[in-house]
Amino acid sequence: PKDNIERAVKKGAGEMDGVSYEEILYEGYGPHNVALIVEVLTDNRNRTIASVRHAFSKGGGNLGSSNSVQYMFDRMGSITVRKAAIDEDQLTELILEAGADDIYTQDPNFYQVITSPANFDNVRSYLEEKELEMLSAEVIWNPQNRVEIEDSKKAEQVIKLIDMLDDDDDVKSVHSNF
């Protein structure tokens, strides 16, 4: 286990010599028509596709072709800021200076700053320079519509598949419309 952990850390830091990694996007449907986008970073495309396909199959889903679910999501930068850290007017002024696209204020505890993926690093760096504490900052696949699953057993099936995919060392992130 120690070797696996060290290898995973080196892989994440890009410190493994002579190994080239590629980013790949897999798409498919989970149980109950939940759309999934799986982002991977791998040094072995064949191993990873087999692992992802196995997880989809075992989890009651189907691995789809390229662009089979991507059209249901918007790619965007998302930065989360605690409301207690700054007032809305101050944050709005900062994000306009930084070049962000929008701010969502519906959550009672957090603001969500939205950027284009191309401008994400600039906005994040600008907010860091202004010493604004960010709880999260990442480029995400945001679903245009969410699938509501009322039945807890059905929801558990979806969560189980997402967890199986997430447990794969090559998987960077899993996005769903659930």
For each feature predicted by the language model, list its residue ranges.
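Long, contiguous binding/interaction regions
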Residues: 1-31, 41-76, 80-149, 153-178
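Active-site-flanking beta-strand signature of metal-NTP-handling nucleotidyl enzymes
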Residues: 35-38
